[in-house]
């Protein structure tokens, strides 16, 4: 049975996407070789993925401790008060980084289903700065939020799907 062209395109896109997620710095020639496609086909697929916002961007994964930053995870529960439209826009469209400019760099924000309603991961210099960021968040939108849990990351085993290249030296901490 012949598959439709849409099914084939989706399968080809997923192959290219998987290669980009392994290492987005690879050349189009290398990606094409790994996928078994022509260079032009890979270029067209990547362009299509970018145009349709399936690929949001490309990032470099760095050891932020080298820059004097520590990684924190903030788990937040909502309370029963409904969000105002302006607060929704502030949380989704604006940057939480602006709450403490030059102090905090927000990595990820997820709205979740489960014990907590949101997860915010960020980098700051120390626990005091992390607590200041939490205080600033609660100062601005605290009436909509319940309890929170602040966690400091000791070290990443994997980051963005890639294994930490220094993991062998960190095994003793497990």
Region annotations inferred by a language model:
Residues 1-174:
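A compositional/biophysical signature of low hydrophobicity enriched in polar/charged and small residues
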């Amino acid at each position: 049975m012949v598959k439709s062209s849409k099914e084939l395109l989706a399968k080809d896109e997923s192959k290219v996407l998987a290669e980009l997620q392994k290492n987005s710095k690879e050349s189009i020639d290398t990606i094409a070789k790994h996928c078994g496609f022509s260079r032009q086909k890979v270029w067209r697929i990547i362009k299509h993925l970018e145009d349709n916002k399936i690929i949001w961007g490309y990032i470099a994964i760095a050891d932020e401790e080298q820059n004097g930053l520590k990684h924190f995870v903030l788990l937040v529960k909502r309370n029963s008060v409904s969000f105002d439209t302006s607060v929704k826009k502030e949380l989704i469209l604006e940057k939480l980084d602006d709450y403490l400019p030059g102090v905090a760099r927000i990595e990820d924000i997820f709205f979740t289903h489960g014990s907590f309603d949101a997860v915010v991961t960020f980098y700051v210099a120390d626990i005091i700065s992390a607590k200041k960021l939490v205080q600033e968040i609660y100062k601005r939108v605290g009436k909509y939020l319940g309890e929170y849990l602040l966690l400091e990351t000791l070290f990443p085993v994997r980051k963005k799907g890639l294994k930490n290249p220094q993991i062998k030296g960190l095994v003793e901490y497990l």
